[in-house]
């Protein structure tokens, strides 16, 4: 029998947002969570062994997440980044779909702030790749005020149809997006969420954006048109391990995500 004590009031989704890819939010009259009989189950009650979460949480949850991120990022050796150089923080659209998007935006902001704090480098930019909609991250950048946070001309949404750059790898020439690599250094800002596990069975998930969000369509299409999602995992790894990318790779910052929320940050 169902334990009624496990049932809680429905957790409401984030409010509908204006987008060129969706309907006007004013047309959304009712959410599924508002239908009769709906409830929410708390995973921490079903699985007590789950670690505590930072977010969702109280009103200061995002502030706590920022502090956790800064503590981890301050441990990273960034001594090779010089004040007069440039750094691109690389992000992917998936991160903005996690728990409303705010936690990923916080990680991006903290990554920027830590670089400036530790190195004195002022030319820190954001390059955010897309999923199925070529300009969706431009909307995310504005929605989370990342354009204001980074400053004029420092943020860009990049798409697989943008100008490319050839990257020589152990399997031949593959193609990245030129704007992704137009800085002295790159920082890979990602997450551990497993919702897209069907694409890769967790094989090389950590570097998948190098063959997707950061790649030109000729290379990105290997996941879907050429070899299939799982067989094509080697393309992202090949790009990441290429001499060109390794010459620019500084470090990575990851949002650690459980099925019940954000549990931490890892940077290395």
What annotation goes with each model-predicted range?
Residues 72-89, 120:
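Glycine-rich phosphate/diphosphate-binding loops that line cofactor/substrate pockets in enzymes
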Residues 170, 176-181, 189-268:
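Catalytic cores of enzyme domains
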Residues 84-93, 122-137, 152-163, 252-258:
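Core alpha/beta catalytic barrel or barrel-like domain that forms the active/cofactor pocket
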Residues 2-64:
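N-terminal amphipathic/basic leader segments beginning at the initiator methionine
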Residues 134-201:
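An acidic, phosphate/nucleotide-engaging active-site surface
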Residues 59-67, 94-105:
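Short, glycine-rich nucleotide/cofactor-binding loops
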Residues 87-91, 111, 174, 187:
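Buried hydrophobic positions in well-ordered alpha/beta secondary-structure cores of metabolic enzymes
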Residues 101, 105-152:
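Membrane helical hairpin/interfacial module
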């Amino acid at each position: 029998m169902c334990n009624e004590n496990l049932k809680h009031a429905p957790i409401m989704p984030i409010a509908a947002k204006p987008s060129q890819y969706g309907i006007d939010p004013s047309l959304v009259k009712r959410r599924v969570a508002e239908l009769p009989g709906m409830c929410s189950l708390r995973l921490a009650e079903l699985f007590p062994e789950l670690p505590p979460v930072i977010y969702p949480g109280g009103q200061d949850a995002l502030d706590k997440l920022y502090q956790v991120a800064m503590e981890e990022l301050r441990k990273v050796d960034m001594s090779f980044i010089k004040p007069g150089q440039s750094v691109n923080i690389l992000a992917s659209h998936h991160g903005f779909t996690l728990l409303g998007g705010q936690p990923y935006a916080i990680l991006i902001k903290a990554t920027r702030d830590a670089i400036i704090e530790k190195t004195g480098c002022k030319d820190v930019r954001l390059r955010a790749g897309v999923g199925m909609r070529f300009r969706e991250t431009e909307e995310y950048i504005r929605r989370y005020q990342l354009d204001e946070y980074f400053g004029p001309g420092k943020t860009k949404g990049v798409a697989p149809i943008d100008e490319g750059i050839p990257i020589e790898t152990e399997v031949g020439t593959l193609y990245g997006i030129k704007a992704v690599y137009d800085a002295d250094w790159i920082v890979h800002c990602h997450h551990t969420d497993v919702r897209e596990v069907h694409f890769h069975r967790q094989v090389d998930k950590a570097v998948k954006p190098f063959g997707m969000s950061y790649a030109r369509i000729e290379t990105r299409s290997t996941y879907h048109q050429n070899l299939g999602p799982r067989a094509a995992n080697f393309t992202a790894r090949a790009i990441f391990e290429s001499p060109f990318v390794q010459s620019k790779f500084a470090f990575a910052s990851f949002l650690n995500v459980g099925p019940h929320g954000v549990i931490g940050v890892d940077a290395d």
